[in-house]
């Protein structure tokens, strides 16, 4: 750790404190993420070290670069490139963003690019949300942070500061207790983020797992064996769920054009195997007039 000098604490993420720091060898500003481990008495699990080491190989313009992993007996520090703006902060400080369909399209394209790259390397995110989509102010490049950390460390129910980890972007198969799930969970999250960029408010802001499910059901309709074959076999599915009818997405996201609505509906498909993939989404007609904003 002698190589890195902490400058200031910049935030508290899902896994621990994040510092702005200086790499004394290169004089570069970096982000230092201190991972707080659940079973601290047992030290750093070797599986976590292996998982994280694989992430150093990930190299893509829309992924936050992991430069280094430093671990001692009890804790692990991840050294990332430093970016001080995230999509949540940007949306909060810039409400007129919703009136810029070109920038929304560019950001969505970049998110999907990063997700498709990770999925092609068999890495899932599982916790995509506006707070871990970082923006480079100089280039307008958008980069995904924290990819792969869920597999290495699990997703806690609460952060170490006891904030509840958000459920707003969580796919219905996870909420319904599916043991096996895969890359479609990230596409669902991206769909939720897409709608939020357009509406300037979250699509499904649930405050508990059941509230989250019901917020989804009220808009997309309560799933059944017709709309989602196999749903009734998921551990937390109840036949007693209230039965809501699906709303027309055009009334839910009124400022989105028909191509955007078509893409959004394909990202928010209930049946995971029928959900569009990130790679397919990049080819969607919504992006045909895309100019990546530089």
Curated annotation (Swiss-Prot):
Stored Pfam families: Pkinase (PF00069)
Keywords: ATP-binding, Cell cycle, Cell division, Kinase, Mitosis, Nucleotide-binding, Phosphoprotein, Serine/threonine-protein kinase, Transferase
UniProt GO cellular component terms: cyclin-dependent protein kinase holoenzyme complex; cytoplasm; nucleus
Residues with Phosphothreonine modification: 14, 161
Binding-site list for ATP: 10-18, 33
Coiled-coil spans in chain: none
Enzymatic reactions: L-seryl-[protein] + ATP = O-phospho-L-seryl-[protein] + ADP + H(+); L-threonyl-[protein] + ATP = O-phospho-L-threonyl-[protein] + ADP + H(+); [DNA-directed RNA polymerase] + ATP = phospho-[DNA-directed RNA polymerase] + ADP + H(+)
GO BP term, example: regulation of G2/M transition of mitotic cell cycle
Molecular function via GO: ATP binding; cyclin binding; cyclin-dependent protein serine/threonine kinase activity; protein serine kinase activity; RNA polymerase II CTD heptapeptide repeat kinase activity
Domain Protein kinase: 4-287
Family stated for the protein in its record: Belongs to the protein kinase superfamily. CMGC Ser/Thr protein kinase family. CDC2/CDKX subfamily.
Biological function: Plays a key role in the control of the eukaryotic cell cycle. Component of the kinase complex that phosphorylates the repetitive C-terminus of RNA polymerase II.
Protein name in the entry: Cell division control protein 2 homolog
Source species: Zea mays (Maize)
Organism taxonomic ancestry: Eukaryota, Viridiplantae, Streptophyta, Embryophyta, Tracheophyta
């Amino acid at each position: 750790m002698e190589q890195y000098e902490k400058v200031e604490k910049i935030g508290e993420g899902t896994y621990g404190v994040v510092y702005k720091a200086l790499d004394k060898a290169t004089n570069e500003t970096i982000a230092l993420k201190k991972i707080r481990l659940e079973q601290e008495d047992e030290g750093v699990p070797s599986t976590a070290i292996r998982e994280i080491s694989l992430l150093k190989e990930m190299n893509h313009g829309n992924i936050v670069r992991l430069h280094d992993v430093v671990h001692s007996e009890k804790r692990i520090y991840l050294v990332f490139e430093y970016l001080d703006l995230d999509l949540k902060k940007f949306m909060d400080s810039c409400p007129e963003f919703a009136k810029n369909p070109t920038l929304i399209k560019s950001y969505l394209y970049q998110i999907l690019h990063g997700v498709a790259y990770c999925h092609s390397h068999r890495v899932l995110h599982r916790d995509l949300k506006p707070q871990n989509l970082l923006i480079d102010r100089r280039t307008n490049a958008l980069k995904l942070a924290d990819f792969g950390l869920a597999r290495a460390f699990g997703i806690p129910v609460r952060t170490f500061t006891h904030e509840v980890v958000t459920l707003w972007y969580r796919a219905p198969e996870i909420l319904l207790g599916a043991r096996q799930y895969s890359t479609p969970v990230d596409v669902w999250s991206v769909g939720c983020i897409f709608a939020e960029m357009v509406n300037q408010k979250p699509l499904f802001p649930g405050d508990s797992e059941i509230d989250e499910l019901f917020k989804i059901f009220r808009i997309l309709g309560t799933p059944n064996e017709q709309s989602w074959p196999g749903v009734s076999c998921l551990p937390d599915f109840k036949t007693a769920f209230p039965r809501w009818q699906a709303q027309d997405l055009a009334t839910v996201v009124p400022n989105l054009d028909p191509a955007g609505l078509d893409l959004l509906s394909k990202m928010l498909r209930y049946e995971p195997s029928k959900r569009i993939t990130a790679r397919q989404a990049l080819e969607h007609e919504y992006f045909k007039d895309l100019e990546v904003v530089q």
